[in-house]
A protein has these predicted regions:
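Catalytic cores of secreted/periplasmic lytic hydrolases that degrade extracellular macromolecules
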Residues: 2-6, 11-124
């Protein structure tokens, strides 16, 4: 239950570091990324609802790594563009959660469950 309460508390906080969830969702949709609400939930989980140091300093919304190091961007919108590039040739439709699991998007074995929880509890 601690995980659930932590995630809910995280979701109730307000983004103050250059982007709101609405702005991120708009940018995800603008790029035509499939399943935008799942992708937004990923960003919220990866960044602690846009409050993490990686988000604030490096503008990395998705925990994306290049050559084993977390990517740094000059603006958070570049992170959305990079996310699309990372998945565009790999996602061929179907269950997006299964896709994320198949490609090993995150090392946390509970990652998909956490993303689903965010989608469900925040009416995404």
């Amino acid at each position: 239950m601690k995980m659930a309460s932590t995630i809910i508390a995280m979701m109730l906080s307000v983004a103050v570091h250059g982007q709101t969830r609405e702005q991120v969702l708009t940018e995800i949709k603008r790029h035509g990324i499939p399943h935008p609400h799942i992708v937004l939930a990923q960003a919220r989980l990866e960044t602690g609802n846009f409050t993490s140091r990686r988000c604030r300093r490096d503008h990395n919304l998705f925990g994306i790594k290049h050559n084993g190091k977390y990517a740094r961007y000059s603006h958070w919108k570049e992170s959305v563009t990079d996310y699309k590039q990372c998945i565009s040739n790999r996602y061929k439709g179907g269950d997006y959660y299964a896709f994320l699991r198949r490609i090993g998007y995150a090392s946390d074995p509970n990652y998909i469950g956490k993303v689903k929880h965010i989608v469900k509890t925040t009416n995404l």
